Amino acid sequence: MDHAELTTEQVLKRDIPWESYMANKLISGTCLQLLRRYDHKPESQRGPLLDEDGPSYVRVFLNILRNISKEDTVEYVLALIDEMLAVNPKRAALFYDNSLSGEDIYDPFLRLLLKGNWFVQEKSCKILTQIISARPKMQNGIVPNGEASNSKSKLTSTQDVLRGLVDWLCSQLRNPTHPNCSVPTAMHCLATLLREQYVRALFVQADGVKLLIPLISPASTQQSIQLLYETCLCIWLLSFYDAAVDYLSTTRVMPRLVEVVKGSTKEKVVRVVIMSIRNLLAKGAFAAQMIDLGLPHIVQNLKAQAWTDEDLLDALNQLEIGLKDNLKKLSSFEKYKQQVLLGHLDWSPMHKDPSFWRENINNFEENDFQILRVLMTIIDTSADTTALAVACYDLSQFLQYHPSGRIVVADLKAKDRVMKLMNHENAEVRKNALLCVQRLFLGAKYASFLQT
């Protein structure tokens, strides 16, 4: 059978020759007794056994993984442990019982993670993630399993395991072993591991942050929605770590997050994206970009929807306040750009301020004269008379202050589009459309000369 398509249910139907292993002294008589009580029993019987003597079963499983290399048996024991933890994740604490303080509880899984087939790798990864995340925290200098907190071997072992785990997860994101399962498995484990600051540092060092960005895109199927959610959860966890934020500021993470939040109706996805954006805004590197992407307007639209999650509602309120505060701090040109991109033009002082136009005229060349193109869209489509009048006036100001203004505006085929507004019913619109056309025609001969 193809191990890449093997399921837990198929593996757990196997009959493992435990008696043969005992005869060959690979397991003890006590192990055999425990396995007979546990093997192929329903959870209603296994649960009480684990409640009564869970650490003994953990020791049996670890010994088998350490001493027996037969693939069918290794897969079977990993499936048993995975099922045990899936039924009750708190059972991961059994690995830290005092009676197991001398056991190397991580090594069997780390070894299999690097050597096994896909089924073995996936189970080892999930199990290792669960048990290392459940390790006891130090209290009064003593780790609850009885080892002193200054035990260098224990600390190094934990660090080595986390490093090995993070490296393996990054390798799966770069070059998946399984075409369909590697990436979801890696993201599921990272969404747990990145809760630790030390793991965040390891992930950044392993150049893992850039591997998340392509995974942030609108999703439709249940599986892809879960992958998107866990990816965005990882971004949220990384937003608490400055080195990760510094790296994120060099990527296209913000446009992708905004695209997701615009297109998603799944509340948990919207919540984790908004909470990520809120944290990134607080770090200060993304404010202008958020405003350029129209996030203030998006937040207003989201607030108008009937969300039930209190964390999401709080995050939306905080984000709205934060964006308003940052908008006040932005330069006059950034404020102007925000007005244009949102189509919210009014007669704020900068429009008629000669120094604004002199100081910022070259900024209008950004993104292939994006602002001029948006002004033309407003002229073509807006029903707001103030926006139309201001757009015509701003276009005339560009003609006046930019050395190649008339050529640029002519290339946009603006003349006929503005001339239509010279017959507009609103006097303010007519006046500013006329001003714009006059400035365009006054230099027509000069513009023609420059183009030859």
UniProtKB/Swiss-Prot annotation:
State the UniProt keywords alphabetically: Hydrogen ion transport, Ion transport, Transport
Q: Which InterPro entries match?
A: ARM-like, ARM-type_fold, Armadillo, ATPase_V1-cplx_hsu, ATPase_V1-cplx_hsu_C, ATPase_V1-cplx_hsu_C_sf
Q: Does the keyword NAD apply?
A: no
Molecular function (GO) terms listed?
A: proton-transporting ATPase activity, rotational mechanism
Claim: Transport is one of the keywords in the record: yes
Family matches, as Pfam families: V-ATPase_H_C, V-ATPase_H_N
Q: Where are the transmembrane segments?
A: none
GO cellular component, alphabetical, reads: vacuolar proton-transporting V-type ATPase, V1 domain
Description of how the protein assembles with itself and partners: V-ATPase is a heteromultimeric enzyme composed of a peripheral catalytic V1 complex (components A to H) attached to an integral membrane V0 proton pore complex (components: a, c, c', c'' and d).
Annotated family = Belongs to the V-ATPase H subunit family.
What is the recorded function of this protein according to its Swiss-Prot or TrEMBL entry? Subunit of the peripheral V1 complex of vacuolar ATPase. Subunit H activates the ATPase activity of the enzyme and couples ATPase activity to proton flow. Vacuolar ATPase is responsible for acidifying a variety of intracellular compartments in eukaryotic cells, thus providing most of the energy required for transport processes in the vacuolar system.
Name of this chain's protein = Probable V-type proton ATPase subunit H
